[in-house]
């Protein structure tokens, strides 16, 4: 969990898919995998698209948590920050916490003392997940944020980044998904000549919690105490 504004613990949301193949017949250990949801999505995205069939066909237990900072619960605060960019620091700060939450979830998934000790993740008293490795797959926003997450993870050795990218200050003006948010931001900052400068200033803060700030760590230059990816 993270810390709320009043200093109290703030529980992190969690949803998982355990495929039937893990429960039918003799106990079989599945590969644990973290799923990163799309733009302003939520943890329940793990239940959508091809994820259930992927888990069944390839023997995986998929879990997800909200990528707070850019989850469905953050739309209001993001809109508020876009009309007053002095408040923008809230977004990258929460994104950093979202990365931490996913790191803890990954450790919980494959650690011998983690989720496998809970009856909900067992078959005939045995854990349904292996405890040797943990993996990541993200799509859209999850593919983008997965770059930073994998770069700092002490546990991931393989990640699948679908529609991966970096540098939100370059991505936003080129994305049709930003049109709705541009309708919020641009009336507050009507000078079009200032927009590139504003995006550049936003990026300075964003770098600490998106792939642009971790590109030099993603592949052959991992941080200390982390594996090669």
Give residue ranges: language-model regions.
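N-terminal cap/lid segment of alpha/beta-hydrolase-fold proteins
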Residues: 1-29
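Phosphate/oxyanion-binding active-site loops and adjacent basic polyanion-contact surfaces
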Residues: 3-14, 94-103, 207
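Generic beta-strand/beta-sheet core signal
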Residues: 17-19, 35-37, 63-66, 137-139, ...
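Cap/lid segment of the alpha/beta-hydrolase catalytic domain
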Residues: 25-123
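Alpha-helix capping and helix-loop boundary segments enriched in small/acidic/polar residues
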Residues: 27, 41, 86-97, 136-137, ...
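Loop/turn elements at helix/coil->beta-strand transitions in domains of secreted/extracellular proteins
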Residues: 28-32, 58-61, 131-133, 154-158, ...
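Primarily recognizes the serine-hydrolase "nucleophile elbow" in alpha/beta-hydrolase
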Residues: 115, 120-173
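The feature captures the conserved acid-bearing segment of alpha/beta-hydrolase catalytic domains
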Residues: 164-229
């Amino acid at each position: 969990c993270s810390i709320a504004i009043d200093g109290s613990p703030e529980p992190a949301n969690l949803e998982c898919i355990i495929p039937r193949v893990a429960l039918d017949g003799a106990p079989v250990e599945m590969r644990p995998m973290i799923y990163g949801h799309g733009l302003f999505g939520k943890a329940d995205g793990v239940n959508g698209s091809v994820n259930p069939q992927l888990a069944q066909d390839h023997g995986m237990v998929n879990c997800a948590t909200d990528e707070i900072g850019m989850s469905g619960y953050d739309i209001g605060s993001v809109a508020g920050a876009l009309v007053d960019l002095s408040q923008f620091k809230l977004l990258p700060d929460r994104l950093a916490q979202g990365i931490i939450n996913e790191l803890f979830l990954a450790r919980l998934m494959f650690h011998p003392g983690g989720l496998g000790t809970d009856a909900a993740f067992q078959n005939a008293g045995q854990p349904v997940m292996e405890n040797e490795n943990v993996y990541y797959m993200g799509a859209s926003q999850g593919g983008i944020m997965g770059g930073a997450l994998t770069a700092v993870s002490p546990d991931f050795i393989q990640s699948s980044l679908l529609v991966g990218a970096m540098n939100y200050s370059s991505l936003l003006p080129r994305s049709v998904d930003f049109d709705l948010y541009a309708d919020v931001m641009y009336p507050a900052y009507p000078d079009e000549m200032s927009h590139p400068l504003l995006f550049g200033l936003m990026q300075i803060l964003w770098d600490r919690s998106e792939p642009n700030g971790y590109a030099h760590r993603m592949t052959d230059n991992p941080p200390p105490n982390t594996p090669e990816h």
